């Protein structure tokens, strides 16, 4: 009798252990780990944290049932019949070598299925090279260096328009102003951070300007994180270009604007690449000093109201509680990439990387958080549906000025001089 | 001509600010042979103090720099008491590594509490005010910061060279044991030196809030330039730090404008290497 009781007790224990191990194994298998690799420290940390929050917001939409949101995968819970997306964060500090080693760590040790990253083009380049060698998927939201999709990579996919596309758009806008408003813009200055992103943006600016007959009178690279930008702004002021194209991230952007105010100089028009211009946190600190600058954007609250209402719902429900601000043009694109990847996985019906890559390369994906409404990748990974508009900021509100189809406000041209503000 | 004058003035104003940041480091390095790797983070902390005093209490950095100076004096003393004192005389790299750890702690603490957001005070008394001299535009916040820096530096020079306390500091720097035999409390001297070093960088950081955005990485390049200035000017020499800093400010400004903006730091470090090769103890070292 005692032996039977003891045997029964032991058998029950073993059965419970097996069931727990089994359910743990089942639970472990029901997650898809996605790495997010962004600058969480360093000069671009504000933007990096926003990018992570955007991906987390997208993960919440995918993982939970959201009947109120009309976006792909929002109405169901998880993908592949209940798999949840688990985000694994990593910080590349804005350094290419750290990006490379963190990508290796994410793929090899954390065993992530794919990586979304890296904001800085200089970090995206080596990290995506790691992915390509490992035959793993790399999704890039907002890194804008055109060179990234000119490498012929199979596993790399990028959402944002390139600096080449934006440069063409900036020049088209200048030509429009010259023709319709008799703007008389003939000379151009370019100021840019001395990194992969900045140098490439400057090269594209040069190409686009020379095609349009604009003369480049100042080419001013600077070291990001500089203690001052006095020499740089003095060089611009001495050359006095009609227009300035800027590629300065975060704090450097605010330092540049404040230094121009200090020396009392402004060009007639300033157009900015994917930079501090697009960051609401930077514009909040600049206040009215930031007014009348322009830049390329794939998102603004005003655009979203008109063209992307579901993005506003996602923003209010999952993004703003984390970031204390609306989406910005950069971070939202990182969120888009998780949606696109999740849709591709769902269509593949499995976690077969090659199958998913084939789907990413050939299919078109609806995207509630993309201005064009869809995402489709060319060979090389560039989003053929990438769209950005030119906005002008006034009182921390971005108003769309070009293309004319999206125009919502009349631009202030030329920029109001400092003394008259 | 106005370009030349502008570049000259920019260089001098930057140099004076660099001098104040570097002066405390020079004193500490000269007296105790200790490199404070957290010096840039002390600057960052001072800027945050004045930013938050301005943002929450509405007190302009023109006045709140005093609070930053006092806070950083206390932080400097605490750093000595808690970290440096326990690592001096142990392994050669112990104080260096300890201050490196402190720098990581301060930076990550501020990153965690205040986020990496760039924070810029607006509506300050001197905001955006400039005046013109001979065609050169002078920013009032930068000018006032430079003047304050010069006053503090001159006060420090007077303290070190003309007071009994200053002679005690110099004696401790020259020979600690001999100074103790002369009845100098070297323990208190070390404590004071760390405190003064903190106060100098606290004043600098506090005033910089009038025109520079504060974020957790703001101190990094200032710290590096401070090391260059200390090595160039000579360890322990405040006068050397002042002259070296102005030289660095001018080299940065002239190279940045007349050669190319992107080479300004190349020129700074090149000058440093040349001087060190010719005179390893720096221009005025003890």
How does the language model describe each region?
Chain A
Residues 2-17, 26-421:
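Extracytosolic ligand-binding ectodomains
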Residues 22-24:
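N-terminal signal peptide c-region/cleavage motif recognized by signal peptidases
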């Amino acid at each position: 009798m005692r032996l039977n009781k003891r045997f029964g007790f032991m058998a029950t224990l073993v059965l419970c252990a097996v069931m727990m191990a089994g359910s743990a194994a089942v639970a472990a298998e029901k997650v898809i780990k996605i790495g997010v690799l962004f600058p969480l420290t360093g000069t671009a940390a504000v933007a990096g944290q926003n990018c992570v929050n955007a991906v987390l917001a997208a993960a919440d939409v995918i993982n939970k049932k959201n009947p109120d949101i009309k976006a792909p995968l929002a109405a169901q819970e998880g993908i592949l019949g209940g798999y949840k997306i688990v985000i694994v964060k990593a910080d590349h500090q804005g350094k290419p070598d750290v990006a490379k080693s963190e990508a290796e760590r994410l793929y090899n040790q954390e065993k992530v299925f794919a990586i979304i990253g890296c904001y800085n083009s200089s970090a995206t380049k080596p990290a995506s090279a790691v992915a390509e060698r490992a035959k793993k998927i790399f999704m890039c939201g907002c890194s804008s260096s055109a060179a990234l999709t000119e490498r012929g990579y199979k596993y790399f996919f990028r959402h944002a328009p390139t600096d080449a596309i934006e440069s063409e758009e900036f020049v088209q806008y200048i030509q429009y102003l010259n023709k319709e408003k008799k703007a008389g813009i003939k000379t151009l200055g370019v100021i840019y951070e001395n990194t992969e992103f900045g140098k490439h943006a400057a090269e594209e600016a040069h190409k686009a300007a020379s095609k349009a007959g604009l003369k480049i009178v100042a080419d001013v690279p600077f070291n990001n994180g500089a203690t001052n930008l006095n020499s740089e702004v003095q060089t611009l002021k001495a050359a006095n270009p009609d227009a300035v194209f800027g590629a300065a991230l975060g704090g450097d952007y605010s330092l540049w604007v404040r230094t121009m105010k200090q020396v009392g100089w402004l060009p007639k028009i300033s157009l900015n690449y994917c930079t501090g211009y697009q960051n609401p946190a930077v514009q909040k600190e600049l206040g009215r000093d930031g007014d009348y600058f322009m830049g390329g954007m794939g998102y603004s609250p005003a655009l979203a109201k008109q063209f992307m209402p579901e993005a506003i719902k996602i923003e209010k429900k999952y993004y703003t509680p984390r970031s204390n601000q609306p989406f910005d043009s950069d971070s939202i694109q990182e969120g888009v990439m998780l949606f696109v990847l999740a849709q591709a996985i769902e269509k593949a019906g499995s976690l077969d990387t090659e199958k998913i890559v084939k789907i990413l390369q050939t299919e078109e994906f609806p995207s509630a958080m993309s201005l064009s409404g869809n995402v489709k990748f060319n060979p090389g990974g560039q989003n053929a549906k990438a769209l950005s508009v030119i906005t002008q900021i006034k009182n921390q509100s971005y108003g769309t000025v070009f293309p004319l189809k999206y125009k919502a406000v009349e631009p202030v041209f030329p920029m109001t001089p400092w003394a008259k503000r | 001509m106005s370009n030349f004058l502008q570049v000259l003035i920019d260089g001098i104003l930057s140099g004076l600010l660099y001098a104040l940041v570097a002066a405390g480091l020079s004193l500490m390095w000269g007296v105790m042979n200790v490199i404070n790797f957290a010096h840039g983070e002390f600057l960052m902390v001072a800027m945050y103090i004045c930013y938050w005093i301005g943002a929450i209490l509405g007190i302009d950095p023109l006045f709140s720099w005093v609070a930053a100076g006092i806070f950083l004096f206390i932080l400097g003393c605490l750093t000595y008491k808690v970290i440096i004192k326990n690592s001096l005389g142990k392994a050669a790299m112990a104080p260096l590594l300890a201050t490196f750890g402190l720098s990581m702690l301060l930076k990550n603490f501020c990153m965690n509490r205040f986020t990496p957001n760039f924070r810029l005070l607006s509506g300050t008394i001197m905001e955006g005010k400039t005046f013109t001299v001979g065609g050169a535009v002078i920013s009032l916040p930068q000018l006032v910061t430079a003047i304050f820096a010069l006053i503090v530096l001159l006060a420090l020079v007077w303290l070190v060279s003309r007071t009994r306390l200053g002679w005690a500091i110099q004696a401790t720097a020259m020979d600690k044991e001999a100074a103790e035999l002369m009845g100098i409390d070297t323990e208190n001297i070390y404590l004071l030196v760390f405190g003064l070093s903190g106060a100098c960088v606290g004043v600098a950081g506090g005033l910089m809030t009038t025109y520079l955005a504060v974020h957790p990485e703001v101190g990094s390049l200032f710290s590096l330039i401070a090391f260059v200035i200390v090595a160039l000017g000579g360890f322990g020499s405040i006068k050397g730090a002042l002259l070296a800093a102005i030289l660095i400010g001018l080299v940065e400004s002239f190279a940045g404008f007349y050669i190319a903006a992107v080479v300004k730091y190349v020129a700074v470090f090149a000058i440093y290497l040349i001087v060190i090769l010719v005179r390893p103890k720096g221009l005025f070292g003890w």
